[in-house]
Design a protein with these regions (language model features):
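Short, surface-exposed connector motifs at secondary-structure boundaries
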Residues: 27, 81-82, 147-149, 202-209
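Cap/insert and terminal regions of metallo-dependent hydrolase folds
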Residues: 159-242
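Metal-dependent catalytic neighborhoods of phosphoester/phosphodiester hydrolases
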Residues: 68-76, 100-103, 218-226
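Catalytic core of the metallo-beta-lactamase
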Residues: 113-169
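Conserved beta-strand hairpin/beta-sheet module of binuclear metal-dependent hydrolase folds
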Residues: 1-46, 140-155, 172
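Active-site metal-binding motif and surrounding structural segment of the metallo-beta-lactamase
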Residues: 38-88
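General small-molecule cofactor/ligand-binding pocket signal
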Residues: 4, 92, 111-116, 129-131, ...
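Active-site neighborhood of phospho(di)ester-bond hydrolases with catalytic His/Asp-centered motifs
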Residues: 32-36, 54-60, 64, 94, ...
Length: 245
């Protein structure tokens, strides 16, 4: 398996960058995880056409994770009308808020499927499961397992015990890292860099990638704060870079 970082900022992109979006691939399947601002253009530079996508998974329905879906649906729906494709891409997402979920569809661009914490998806020998995170709207972490290896994408969340359990001995943990500890407040529904390091250390992950970083931060400062708690392999999830799992 491999994961390509299409965007790593939140809740808005750096100049020339993109918000959350990740292309998960193995020998047979291509699955898009989240589709925030700037992701569609990046995705089209990595695949031949949207027909190549086997599925899309939206971790939650905040716009920095879904805004380009609202454009992608036109690309697919209009191309269907023109006879350029007859494919409707399976799209999995929580239905909260319902009005945003209802906006995802355009014509027959997607086969919409509601996600919940008991959902299990299989693509060949890839098994994908979900854990409920702690965020203002329903948000799911994505856990991908294949041939004894585990990849975990946290999506957005504040610190919670399930983070450690679901990430135990992951080959790769792609973790949101939206705050520096000095900026953390009681009502923040995101992880500080220090907390990310603690999760990675307690879960004994093989490699840690930092994403969903506030675009005004100095990336070295973020990385150095993580390293206070985690002495393992850690780096920024650099946009357009591909990481093996």
């Amino acid at each position: 398996m491999q994961i390509t970082i299409l965007g790593n900022s939140g809740p808005y992109p750096r100049a020339g960058g993109a918000c959350s979006g990740y292309l998960l691939e193995d020998e047979r399947f291509k699955i898009l995880l989240d589709c925030g601002n700037g992701v569609l253009s990046r995705l089209l530079g990595k695949i031949k056409s949207l027909n190549d996508l086997d599925a899309i998974i939206l971790s939650h329905l905040h716009f920095d994770h879904i805004s380009d879906i609202m454009v992608m649906k036109y690309a697919i729906g209009i191309n269907q009308e023109k006879g350029m494709t007859n494919k409707s891409i399976p799209l999995y997402a929580p239905n909260d808020p319902q009005d945003i979920y209802d906006m995802l569809q355009f014509k027959n661009a997607f086969k919409l499927n509601e996600l919940n914490s008991k959902s299990i998806l299989t693509f060949g020998d890839m098994k994908i499961s979900f854990e409920l995170m702690s965020h203002p709207i329903t948000t799911y972490a994505v856990i991908v397992e294949k041939k004894g290896k585990k990849f975990v994408y946290t999506s957005d969340t504040k610190y919670c015990d399930v983070l450690i359990e679901m990430s135990k001995e992951a080959e790769l943990l792609l973790c949101e890292c939206n705050l520096l500890e000095k900026d953390k407040t009681e009502d923040a529904y995101h992880l500080s860099a220090r907390e990310v390091g603690e999760v990675a250390a307690l879960a004994d992950v093989n490699k840690l990638l930092l994403t969903h970083i506030w675009p005004e931060y100095d990336l070295n400062e973020v990385l150095n704060e993580v390293k206070i708690m985690f002495s393992g392999d850690v780096e920024i999830a650099t946009e357009l870079e591909t990481f093996e799992i």
